[in-house]
Amino acid sequence: MRRGQVQKMKRTGSTSLGLVFLTAMLISMRTPIQTVYADEEPITLRVCSWEEYIDLGGWDADEAIALDNGSVIFGERPLYEEFEDWYRETYGREVRVEYSCFGTNEDLYNQLNMGDTYDLVCPSEYMIMKLIAEDKLLPYSQDFYDESDENNYYINNVSPYIRETLETNEIHGESWSKYAAGYMWGITGVLYNPEYVTEEEASTWEIFGNPKFNRQVTLKDNVRDSYFAALGILKADELTDEDFIRSADYHEHLADMMNDVSPETIEAAQNLLDDLMDNVYSLETDSGKADMITGKIVANYQWSGDAVYAMDQADADDFELKFAVPKESTNLWFDGWVMLKSGINGSRDRQHAAEAFVNFVSRTDNAVRNMYYIGYTSSIAGNEEDDTVYEYMKWCYGAGEDDEDIIEYPVGYFFSGDNSDKNYMLETVSSQIGRQLYSQYPPEDIMNRTAVMRYFDDDANKAINQMWINVRCFDINDVPTGVWMAILAVMLVMVWMFYRKSKSKRT
């Protein structure tokens, strides 16, 4: 959780609680009440998302965020509770949110298969693809995409970059945007300690096999992330070839290469990962951040949001960590809101409430609350009339009056779709390159070499999962014949002894 971790980078200022609550009241009054024609029974909306992935409120008074555009951001109560009030005030109908959490995408999938029922869930891109392929998701309504509706905060505020990503990627001929609304997004890379690791050394997936850092680096303890890193190493020469990078169909070929699950590639990846296991300190899911902060390791495969958290923590302890993006390619990931057919079950009321919930958390002030609370980057950018998200980025990373070595950092690709847009040319200190800003809003040249990991079919999933079992445990195919013969001999002796013992009892 990111709250309170970036104080050194924030602009100073004071805000009275009266202004905070006045602003909150004005926000809640800025839209007219509409009526949903349905029964008057309260709607129960069942939402399931990641743990600590939404603002739970309870902010201290001095945490109020005063932005240069006049907005004041303050988290008093959990957002899902505030949604209930907003829905009643906006649509004249009671809704009750049952909010629960899951630990991993696979946990969520298993919960659904075991009979748990939810209306709205927030899995990662590959699980969204799997649920689409299995016909478990309900498309968003046409009303949800109506840009003339001022309450449709999602379609009016989503980043052009995220919107294009969702619209241009397909599964079974249908775009992701038909079923998914972006929530948080990021990339993967290498969190490193610059005292021991150079930027060049950290800017390649090959760092995990670099003997210089034997037992000082960690990989992720999940097959998709580690397989991606392995592909980056196996295909490094082609991925960094200038002719390949300049080719007209570069992005299509890049995606194909970073999703190669041919038997030959899986076998090569297993052999490589076997070698990497001799060099890494461990496989980890969450402990890598703490290990970097305590100095147990010097480099760590990391998601951009967790990298920001670790850098914030290190700053608080007066030492520096940095984030590098491998030159070969990086994984673009996102988590998105999707509606389940089994939960909505044909109910117009529940679908309307689910879509309204997505819109509510996509309001720019709420997007800022979530980013501040959890430390990840929202898919919401705002628009020409509402620059709250951009102002929050300035509040976090903008250069102060006394700062030196100031640079222009373009982020137009995310906010307007034009990276040369002068309205989104952030003035920041040069030290932010490779730091928090760089992690949350990577430069466009890095985004150009991202690839989304696709949903793999059952056969491919089975193959790479078996590969991962072989890597994490052992591959029975690698056991020498002599060992198998010794095991067989021991088993035969045990059977013979059991037979002798049974025979002696009968006599």
Spans of model-derived segments:
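Sec-dependent signal peptide cleavage junction
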Residues: 29-40
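Early extracytoplasmic/lumenal segment of secretory-pathway proteins
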Residues: 40-130, 134
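Hinge/lid segment of periplasmic solute-binding proteins
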Residues: 94, 103-109, 129-185, 199-206
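Periplasmic-binding protein-like
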Residues: 146-152, 270-274, 317-341
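Short loop->beta-strand "edge-of-pocket" segments that line small-molecule binding or catalytic clefts
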Residues: 207-223
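Ligand-binding pocket segment of bilobal, Venus flytrap-like solute-binding proteins
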Residues: 219, 226-230, 238-322
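Mature extracytoplasmic/periplasmic domains
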Residues: 339-441, 492-493
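Conserved C-terminal helix/tail region of periplasmic/extracytoplasmic solute-binding proteins
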Residues: 416-507
